[in-house]
Amino acid sequence: MLAVEQWIKIVPGLVYLNGESLFSNAKLEDDTLTFIYRQCINSYPKFFKMDGLSRLGFIATELLLQNADKSHIADNNCATLLFNMGGSINNDYHFQQTIADANNFFPSPSIFVYTLPNIVTGEIAIRHHFYGETASYVLGKWDSKTIIQIVESTFDSDRSIEKCICGWIEYINEQVFEADLFLISRISNCEHTLLTEKTITTIKDFNMEQTILKLKKEIIEVLNLEDMQ
């Protein structure tokens, strides 16, 4: 059996670990990812060289593993499987800006290296010394069935894998991003929530009402409206 041992949700201004809010919304208003890095990590300078997608995956994984049982997380027994819809679209856009003008042509190697969505899985593996399977999948939309099938197939094909970091990670820009990551474990009892389509979809949709209200507030402020129904 596979179970969800821990889960993390990060969107602009909101961070939830296993359903508990980690920071007050007011503290996260400006730069959510940099704020979390400085508050909780602040010891990995390479963070500032990463693109937005890698920063999001890095931060989400750090928080996900912070209080996890690490007794079975070592070397080659932890896989990393991430999914999204936009690939590395944010960094692709920035790289395109460096080559769009023939008269101002300056392709940047530091930007180009992040024009693959699977780079984030590499950053996570390097940080935590994981040598298990790493993979990044671009889907047409959130698809819990496909995600579950791939995770189960990964565990079935390699019996040495005990845990897996998996989930949805999307980074469009500094104002639009989302991470819904899960620490999945191979278990022999029902101590944790079983991995099902309903489980991961419920977590992905967790507290969406508050997220929507926050977005409405931002729209009101941008448009200088007094009310918005």
Please place each PLM-identified region on the residue numbering.
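Conserved "HGTGT" condensation-loop signature of ketosynthase/thiolase-family condensing enzymes
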Residues: M1-Q229
